[in-house]
Amino acid sequence: MKMLFAIPGLPVSDIEKSTAFYRDKLGFTVAVRKEGFAKLRRDAVEIHLWEAADEGWRTRVGSEPIVSGAESFIAGTGGCRVSVEGVEEWYRVVQPLGILHDNAQLEVTPWGTREFAVVDPDNNLVTFFERK
């Protein structure tokens, strides 16, 4: 048995707004779009977005656990790392867009990468990195 790759699924509060962000700001194409879900691709990278907009937890009664898996408080709790070639060039493209994470400018890391991170409209963290 050998694992081959992973596809991140990021929880978002507004699927339309988030799909537009990944398409318009980061250059992804929309491969699949249906209610509450989007599959996005750019080159060999695929990211899935799923809408976490269930507000039912706010008004529920009793002590039953919250179990829909799409509760609104989950939106923005995700993140992923994307390996790229030409991270410095990509940083120059992304920097003027105003989407960089405040504490994740382009840097050399102790674990041997050059990387930076952006945040989507829900504050999911997407880190772009290149091995040195």
Regions found by a protein language model. Name each.
Residues S18-R23, V94, N123:
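Conserved active-site tyrosine of GNAT-family acetyltransferases
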Residues L125-F128:
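Short glycine-/small-residue motifs
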